Amino acid sequence: METKDFRTATEFVSRENAGINTAWIEGIDLGYSGVKVFSETGYGCFPSYAKKVEKDFTTLAPKPEMIVYTDLETGGKWLVGAMAEDITSSGDTSDTENTLYGRYRYYSPMFKIISETAMGLAMIKRDGNNFKNINDNRKVVIQTGLPEDYMEDADALKETMLGRHAFKLELFDSKEPIEFRFGVDDVYVMPQPKGSLFSICVKNDGTLHELSGNFMSDWVIVFDPGFGTLDIYPIKSGHVEKGYTNSNLGMRRVLSETSALIKRQYNIDVPVTRMQKYLETGKVVSHDRRNFRSESHDFTDLLAKANAKVCEEALDTLRDAVPDLAEYKYLIVTGGTGEAWLPIIEERLSGMETLTVIAANQNDKLPMMYSNVRGYYLSRYAAIMSGQKQ
């Protein structure tokens, strides 16, 4: 394994997805680690982090992971995603875990920045060496999601996304900034695992996959480990059972365990909030200030150990949360953390002849971190199309 595979990606890939001429639909997954978007023009992702900079901040040259946000009303400027992470040292204590990963983060300035950046990213398309905003004043409709046990927070999430938005983005290697001025009147929130179930049942053109009937009629579990939570979503013959959310099993816990192992082995403090940039190289640095010495230390094996430990705990939780597991036919594994855990899950459950483990990206082959957001988008597309046909 490579540690950089655990770092949240920064990308936007232009491609044609099913669209509708009466609404601009945006699927947005505001994860604790990464923000994912899906629209008729493509899909993209960036780390869920932003850092305010001076208004005269400039970069020496555009970078592939560059995202700079400017509020068109206040002039406030923020670095977003990987660049914001990269300029922040491991000793920076300005961001607490509660600010970044707390359940009630909706009213923080950072959450506003990353959610508006996501809205803008879902409106762009590559045009030669630049990106351009191609929303043609259609009504903006957003479909997003929350962990099963957090659905009572839906109104607070909607409140942060509704209304008027005016900002500018400098994106990636594009030479021209892009302005966005639009309103959002409709925001829909669904349980996160439902997004993956919809994604696995629907093809890119919005029609049902040939195997969708199996997933809708059999006993199915959606196993959705995210950054902050593990969602277990049982479905029996099309009837959705009460889901289960564990807020201590996910990639955040993996990084917390890794941080503790690094401290124990190398006596280096790397808090979870600063771990992302070190995943790029898989190395941390010890610094002897008195004698002007420094040394790098590889933590790949420590990350692998922590990843396996937390995955095993998650599977133990699955066993306890679903006592009749042997009666289920499919276990759908989804999310970026699910992709990191998939080999362990397949090996651990290989003795269950009656249960088939399925990756949620099986009919699109996008990275599994996009499974929920793809499902968000296609579910809203299907709902609007169904309404039009009535």
Please give the residue ranges for each predicted region:
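Short aromatic-centered micro-motifs
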Residues: 37, 234, 285
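Glycine-rich phosphate-binding loop plus the immediately following alpha-helix
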Residues: 193-197, 205, 227, 231-274, ...
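Nucleotide/phosphate-binding catalytic cleft detector across ATP-hydrolyzing
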Residues: 1-220, 240-242, 247, 251, ...
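A mobile "lid/hinge" subdomain adjacent to the ATP/sugar-phosphate binding pocket shared
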Residues: 264-305
